[in-house]
Amino acid sequence: MDYINAIGRRKAAVARVYLSEGSGKIVINKREIEQYFPSSILQYIVKQPLLKLDVAAKYDIKINLRGGGFKGQSEAARLAIARALVKINPDDKPALRSEGFITRDPRVVERKKPGRPKARKRFQFSKR
């Protein structure tokens, strides 16, 4: 196995994942996961599909992350890793889907409308 690649998106974040057989090392934008995501919660979000299938020490993962914030980036990486694992073994898809790792979250920021200060907010209305 050379390497498997997959893309995951969440909000404004895009994650490109390259999965290869190895010892469980995760590198994000040329930095270790502990340095890129200091929060253990965000590290856990990224590792969730690997822990669910119990293959955390089986693959080395290289991730390129762009755009968005920390939370969006971690969830984009989670989706990309889940998609890559399904490419390797399609039998894992039901287990990952039941946890919601395969589903792309479609919620994105609503655009600002003209004639309003924000997407939904209106300027103060004066009756008289």
From Swiss-Prot:
<dbReference type="InterPro" id="IPR020568">
    <property type="entry name" value="Ribosomal_Su5_D2-typ_SF"/>
</dbReference>
<keyword id="KW-0689">Ribosomal protein</keyword>
<dbReference type="GO" id="GO:0003723">
    <property type="term" value="F:RNA binding"/>
</dbReference>
<dbReference type="GO" id="GO:0022627">
    <property type="term" value="C:cytosolic small ribosomal subunit"/>
</dbReference>
<dbReference type="InterPro" id="IPR020574">
    <property type="entry name" value="Ribosomal_uS9_CS"/>
</dbReference>
<dbReference type="Pfam" id="PF00380">
    <property type="entry name" value="Ribosomal_S9"/>
</dbReference>
<feature type="compositionally biased region" description="Basic residues">
    <location>
        <begin position="113"/>
        <end position="128"/>
    </location>
</feature>
<dbReference type="InterPro" id="IPR000754">
    <property type="entry name" value="Ribosomal_uS9"/>
</dbReference>
<dbReference type="InterPro" id="IPR014721">
    <property type="entry name" value="Ribsml_uS5_D2-typ_fold_subgr"/>
</dbReference>
<keyword id="KW-0687">Ribonucleoprotein</keyword>
<dbReference type="InterPro" id="IPR023035">
    <property type="entry name" value="Ribosomal_uS9_bac/plastid"/>
</dbReference>
<protein>
    <recommendedName>
        <fullName>Small ribosomal subunit protein uS9</fullName>
    </recommendedName>
</protein>
<dbReference type="GO" id="GO:0006412">
    <property type="term" value="P:translation"/>
</dbReference>
<feature type="region of interest" description="Disordered">
    <location>
        <begin position="106"/>
        <end position="128"/>
    </location>
</feature>
<comment type="similarity">
    <text>Belongs to the universal ribosomal protein uS9 family.</text>
</comment>
<dbReference type="GO" id="GO:0003735">
    <property type="term" value="F:structural constituent of ribosome"/>
</dbReference>
